[in-house]
């Protein structure tokens, strides 16, 4: 088996088999068939990615077909939103089609089924029909109208179409088998009376086809080769085949190819609700501001939050195509946007919780415009000028009056480097009557070649522009908010999912445009929100620089014997835990590697250069340990550690290694 064949997912294997068995490649055709009754969400991106991805792989057309058979719930607004979302993701459809395009053909085929004794009009109440249908372990029984004459069925069905009956008076059912082990095959409904205005056909129709009748026949009309849907539709496949095989008898001359339905596991995401009904409840009860609220899992919400098409497509690629349901950790999605924005977002400085720093030996009337690199990951990003003056803001938690040796930020008597500027030393503080610090008085040193361990971001007070900063977090505090049988999902709403702050930003951001993305250095990735105006800028936090939830996940309880032994064990140092992670890193799955990477990034906060440096000489064959060291080193460099010859040599050796993961980590530094 070739490497290429090994890497195929199970759907691609099916397609390759069909091609090998004589299906012409130019007959391949796929479709994405959303119902226009709501906004697309992250769960839909898997279905979109699979169908359009196959279209790209095989150079085959993909139809965007709207399954618009329920006028009670469907609107043009949703059609427009779906088209916008699919196009934004970077996919191009061959044809824009609608199930309503086929209403007349579906009706004509239904009439033919009645004539062949394969469909009948039932006039019972829904309760009576449900009772006759039986259970999964008990067969159904025939209803009193099952053996109506063909003539009576044709007459009633035409009168249903002409609007002579009220909703619920009659339905059309396929005549299959009321004792069938698959309950979906027990005379399923094909048509119901629904006197609602349709967003495309107006009032032309007052009977509407059901999903199972419409879905397969639309595939057949369009000559779709492979009809791909999620696993919950697997029991429907038998009915899908029954309908298409009977219709084939009526149209095989003009429509020679029968489509094939296959199912894949849908996308389930931790800390996320996918149900349209529940998402609607969040909107209606004002928990979120609308369908495009940046906390919503809708594509419009993700777009507004700052997610990119590339990050979402990369996420779908990493999730892959599976046959079994599983839950994907949302941290994988967050990892993908971090990786994407790390390469593309310009770095800027912003302070969100300011404390004033006065540089007492810097002239009051002096200001300088210093050169700052926009993005060290992108040579073409260039440089910008940032103003420096006597009074600046730094983050409040970047200063402590007293701190230990492992605190590398500003403290009394300690020195730090100001990003793109000078080294300062804290000498004194000014406090209010309650003891709260108002100002930190520092002196600066023009000699920037000195080695100091900490680097802080800052903003010149007199040049700062003010903006509203919306810091978003996960909307739910529970990993699986709709799985608790005893609690409503609304009880797991995270009260801290939105925090609004006033930010002080460097003046280069004064002319930004809606949608632009930046890394606020040391804080995270932010984008310009739609609510921004010329008078007031609004930024959304897309994602932090690291996974802040990794350390919050509950750990399983140890058994009693383990608990007894625990007091005798010394707590392992952060560096030893990082080494331990490194030993198993290369044996982990990609998803587990991402989780471990987040934990190493968190542990790096408690690691110094002196801890890491001895590990630079780790044996070549211990790739996992070297990867772990690189991950930690990258965090230290982000927080101001200066590169030296030992660091550069370690990175260059890693770049030349045969291990692809090691090379990738080294290349990111």
Segments (PLM) and residue ranges:
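Amphipathic alpha-helical scaffolding segments comprising HEAT/armadillo-like alpha-solenoid repeats
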Residues: 574-582, 606-617, 641-652
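Core subunits and conserved enzymes of cellular information-processing
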Residues: 233, 237, 241-243, 310-313, ...
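Residue-level signature of the C-terminal ends
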Residues: 602-607, 622, 635-643, 650-653, ...
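A glycine-rich helix N-cap at a beta->alpha junction
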Residues: 78-104, 109-112, 117-120
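Short coil turns that connect the paired helices of HEAT/ARM alpha-solenoid repeats
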Residues: 586-591, 618-624, 653-661
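Active-site cores that bind ATP or allylic diphosphates and position pyrophosphate for catalysis
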Residues: 68-70, 76, 98, 112-279, ...
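N-terminal catalytic cores of NTP/NDP-binding nucleotidyl/phosphoryl-transfer enzymes
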Residues: 6-83, 199-230
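Amphipathic alpha-helical elements of HEAT/ARM-like alpha-solenoid repeat scaffolds that form extended
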Residues: 592-604, 626-637, 661-669
